UniProtKB/Swiss-Prot annotation:
This is Probable GTP-binding protein EngB. The keyword DNA-binding does not apply. Keywords: Cell cycle, Cell division, GTP-binding, Magnesium, Metal-binding, Nucleotide-binding, Septation. Its cofactor is Mg(2+). NCBIfam families: GTPase_YsxC. The gene is engB. It comes from Rickettsia bellii (strain OSU 85-389).
């Protein structure tokens, strides 16, 4: 068996990890509450109402895991989910919601910045962007923050079932990444149609495998 076939076989095996249900294990609203897990962590971050909770539920095979709401700004803490003691999925608070008080926004920023700087086991961040809206200024700032903290990330375009023209969106993403001198995966996902779910799971499994 060739090395490539061995790698692909291992990735398929790791992909089966996501057939299990993840469980909520901790929530942190301030720095003191941040848990210290020895397991590898993969985080999800995006603008409020980008579809983050729905995607996490799909990835973790648990429809009730992350609370899904039509109200932006619902996720107000960092939530940690344990996937059969193999992986920690991290749900970061959404950004860019104008109705959240400035004091709360400041608290979120401090909390998220600290987590990104100090988490030794954070292997990858998934930057979620609404494919209908394109890359906004807040998204760019988060990408810059991730690179400033030397965090690998990939771009996940959500709600892909509602968009037909992806050529311009891909070009926009590539042009932005070029300004950062960075390259990464661009994955289109839809929690409704399940498009991209397998590709995303495989990318996460590959990330964990490379870190072993």
């Amino acid at each position: 068996m060739t090395d490539e076939k061995v790698i692909n076989k291992k990735l398929v095996g790791d992909n089966k990890l996501f057939r299990h249900q993840a469980k909520f294990v901790a929530g942190a609203m301030d720095i003191k509450q941040l848990p210290n897990f020895a397991l590898p962590q993969i985080a999800f971050v995006g603008k409020s109402n980008v579809g983050k909770s729905s995607l996490i539920n799909t990835i973790c095979n648990n429809k009730k895991l992350a609370k899904v709401s039509n109200t932006p700004g619902r996720t107000r803490q960092i939530n940690f989910f344990n996937l059969v003691d193999k992986l920690i999925i991290v749900d970061l608070p959404g950004y860019g919601f104008a109705q959240v008080p400035n004091q709360v926004k400041d608290q979120w920023e401090i909390l998220i910045n600290h987590y990104l700087r100090k988490s030794d086991n954070l292997k990858l961040v998934n930057l979620l962007i609404d494919s209908r809206r394109g890359i906004k200024e807040n998204d760019k700032k988060v990408a810059e923050l991730l690179l400033a903290n030397k965090r690998d990330f990939q771009i996940i375009f959500t709600k892909s079932d509602k968009v037909t023209d992806r050529k311009n969106l891909n070009l926009e993403a590539q042009n932005f990444l070029a300004t950062l001198n960075y390259s990464c995966n661009l994955i289109y996902v839809s929690s409704r149609s399940k498009e991209g779910a397998r590709e995303l799971k495989t990318s996460l499994a590959k990330c964990i495998k490379l870190e072993k």
